[in-house]
Regions:
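Active-site-proximal N-terminal segment of extracellular/periplasmic enzymes that hydrolyze or transfer
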Residues: 55-63
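C-terminal cap/loop subdomain of S1 sulfatases and analogous C-terminal strand-loop tails that border
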Residues: 1-43, 75-84
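Intrinsically disordered, low-complexity polar regions and short flexible loop motifs
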Residues: 50
Length: 90
């Protein structure tokens, strides 16, 4: 999405293969979590319809998730974050 407000690092653990990375736009919050180098959770919240971020819409929004994955991977590459090695385009 072109309307990224700011990319956020939510948590980064010491081994760099476990943790969270995400992006936030004016409307959406997107987060991925990896454990030992494997993505085990992807979260997408539409804050305009779900301001408390309760309902994860990632599974029913594969096109948006794919766009966010690409944007996040680009950002991680630009910042030399090794977490990019664990992202595969969904």
């Amino acid at each position: 999405p072109k309307d990224i407000v700011q990319p956020y690092y939510f948590v980064q653990y010491d081994n760099h293969s476990t943790g969270y990375r995400g992006l936030r736009t004016a409307r959406y919050t997107f987060v991925v979590h990896a454990t030992n180098g494997k993505i085990d959770e992807t979260v997408l919240y539409d804050r305009s319809n779900d301001p408390y971020q309760i309902h994860n819409i990632a599974r029913r929004s594969p096109k948006q998730v794919g766009q966010f994955y690409k944007q996040l991977k680009t950002w991680l590459n630009q910042t030399n974050d090794s977490f990019t090695n664990y992202l595969t385009i969904q």
